[in-house]
Structures are given as C-alpha cells and as structure tokens.
C-alpha cells in the first residue's frame, strides 16, 4: 500500500514510505527534527500516542491518538507499518514487530534495530526485567544528550537520502 504525499494518506498511485513515531516517550527535540524532515523531504510523519499531541500545521505531519492502555500505541504502529517504512521507537519489542513486517526501526538516540541485533536486545531486556523483578536496581538509560540528537539527525538524514521519494 502507498500514500498520497499531498495528504499524508496512502494510495495505490504514489509510491512512498512513511515515518511512524512512538511519540509518548520520544524526546521533543527528536520530534522537532522529524517535523523539519517531513517538510524538507515531503514525507508523511505520523506520531502515535495515547495522549493529545500538538503538531505544526503541515500536510505531511499527523498525530494519531489511541486509547490509554498497555501497548495500545505499539499495536497501532504495527498495524500502520508497511515494508520500507521507518519507525522511531526505543521500545525493543515494538522494534522487533515492525522489523518482522519489513519496516526499519531507529531509536531516538540514532541506534538502528536490525535482524542481526534484535534478538540480543530482546534477551538483554528480558534479563534486566528479571533483575528488576528480583528487586535489583538496574539503573536506567543515560539522560538524552546533544550528541544523541546529532547521531539521530545523521542517521535520519542518511536514511532519507536513500529511501525518501524524490
């Protein structure tokens, strides 16, 4: 399935990819980069969240609000994802699900999820969950940094140079 870039809706006539964003936990600076990229490359960026999201006016940017609930936004992203799409998420199981559909997955720090690394990431996540369940403090991720933002921007630009419509 494809979409009409003018209206950010898929159609059979216009080949293109879209960017889907797991927006509940996505840093604002990353959303801003995606908004600029949507206008520049004329690609559809769809933010999915269980809360209202304010987005800039653009035919290339839309927000989808889903009901609150465990993994409801993730399920909607998997439903919307098509082969070749880009999904922005830090959620490892969501990344695995969209990779299974033939989409690409990039985390907000600029790290790619791939068929080669997803099993290891899922195993590490499961191990950390077990440690937390046993009462062990595993800490959390480092705070989002300017370097993370630059890495993400670089990876996004490279991806769009190869995959965005011209």
What are these regions (language model features)?
Residues 9-166:
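Nuclease catalytic cores that cleave nucleic-acid phosphodiester bonds
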């Amino acid at each position: 399935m494809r979409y009409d870039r003018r209206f950010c809706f898929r159609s059979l006539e216009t080949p293109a990819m879209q960017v889907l964003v797991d927006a509940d936990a996505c840093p604002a600076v990353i959303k801003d980069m995606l908004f600029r990229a949507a206008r520049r490359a004329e690609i559809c960026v769809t933010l999915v969240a269980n809360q209202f999201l304010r987005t800039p006016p653009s035919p290339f940017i839309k927000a989808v609000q889903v009901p609150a609930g465990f993994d409801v936004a993730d399920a909607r992203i998997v439903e919307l994802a098509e082969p070749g799409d880009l999904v922005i998420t830090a959620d490892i199981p969501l990344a695995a699900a969209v990779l299974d559909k033939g989409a690409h997955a990039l985390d907000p720090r600029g790290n790619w999820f791939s068929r080669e690394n997803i099993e290891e990431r899922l195993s590490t996540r499961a191990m950390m969950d077990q440690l937390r369940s046993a009462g062990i403090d595993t800490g959390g991720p480092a705070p989002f940094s300017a370097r993370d933002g630059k890495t993400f921007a670089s990876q996004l630009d490279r991806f769009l140079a190869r995959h965005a419509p011209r």
